[in-house]
């Protein structure tokens, strides 16, 4: 259920001598808690699960999985791609047990090439671009201040419009279901 880019990163880690495991999803793209947790052991360093899938709409049981994961291995970093749910009220990293999260601006109307990463302070990540002290010494180079400002603006606009958009989608769904029911003479449950 992950994007090709994420799978390629997992393959890169594997090619550097680390064991990589994959949890299977059902035909709808849903990963059960048991399937995910069965991949975790006392040597697991990172576990990653996409919160909401942009193609299928499936929302994974992040909170339940993170809680169970920590009962098996408290030192495993739990990462999630949260961009599909970042504007909803449910995205509370701490409450949901997310210790690392990736967010891409263009998915919410912001500029391409800008993103954000949250990492709990208890995890010390090495720099991946060396030579400067920008971005907490994790990524050297000129900071894209206009891009970051545009990302913040897009996020604020999306959060402001969230309830309105959900209401509109629900109204459209009801109209669609009514037209489908009338056209096919069926009952929708």
Regions found by a protein language model. Give the residues of each.
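Pyridoxal 5′-phosphate
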Residues: 3-189
